[in-house]
Amino acid sequence: MSQDVNELSKQPTPDKAEDNAFFPSPYSLSQYTAPKTDFDGVEHKGAYKDGKWKVLMIAAEERYVLLENGKMFSTGNHPVEMLLPLHHLMEAGFDVDVATLSGYPVKLELWAMPTEDEAVISTYNKLKEKLKQPKKLADVIKNELGPDSDYLSVFIPGGHAAVVGISESEDVQQTLDWALDNDRFIVTLCHGPAALLSAGLNREKSPLEGYSVCVFPDSLDEGANIEIGYLPGRLKWLVADLLTKQGLKVVNDDMTGRTLKDRKLLTGDSPLASNELGKLAVNEMLNAIQNK
């Protein structure tokens, strides 16, 4: 007999691999995860056939987020936020390269994996080797960026691990500078827009000042996520708050699956935006290729 959802614990689940670290509570996972996504098919299967243009994904290599109360949240990149947009891109014909800050393996929130979703699972299996042996971002910058680079877009998936290191990385800053200077796309969602904070490092103002973005609502990280035991405490800083202080305009204060295009910056508000963000990225990239 299945357990009633209201009987599930709202206490975060201890992660025995680390001191004072916790996974989300059973109750929160019942609310935030599902065996399938809203994937409803690929719109442009095989539409890109030339083979030149690729996607550079900057993924998280750190699992633990240290919180205000000294506890750690055991996290990673959210599998739906990573793999569903990539499914649309790969099925359209774009290859994907994976990079992390140090070249260490990508960390995923496997507890959020939709185990009955063929689109997500098949993409995970195709990328598994690259996720375990990613490129070092500094090497990508040195050897593969420039005006003639084969990367048409930079993709930064979410999951709370995106708030660790990536927002303070000079390598991420250089990558975003390159994308902006060379008219390439920046695609990100949920907590992934924390990476955009790096654009303002050691500068009087961010080159992204004035851009509009969707991002995971601070109000949920400050409220419901703690109340239902998804987070074991408060984050030390909030993504939307700091983006706003850098002059970006956060257009949402809720989680509805909203996506947004502002010039070459494509954003989504949460895992609920993964499917539509993937479609948006494919459409925009194909249009850009046609107009080159």
Curated annotation (Swiss-Prot):
Family per similarity comment: Belongs to the peptidase C56 family. HchA subfamily.
GO cellular component, one term: cytoplasm
Name of the protein this chain belongs to: Protein/nucleic acid deglycase HchA
SUPFAM superfamilies documented for this protein: Class I glutamine amidotransferase-like (SSF52317)
A GO term, aspect molecular function: protein deglycase activity
Keyword match Cytoplasm: yes
Pfam family, one: DJ-1_PfpI
Enzyme Commission designation: 3.1.2.-, 3.5.1.-, 3.5.1.124
Organism: Staphylococcus aureus (strain NCTC 8325 / PS 47)
Organism lineage: Bacteria, Bacillati, Bacillota, Bacilli, Bacillales
UniProt entry keywords in alphabetical sequence: Cytoplasm, DNA damage, DNA repair, Hydrolase, Stress response
Keyword flag Cytoplasm: yes
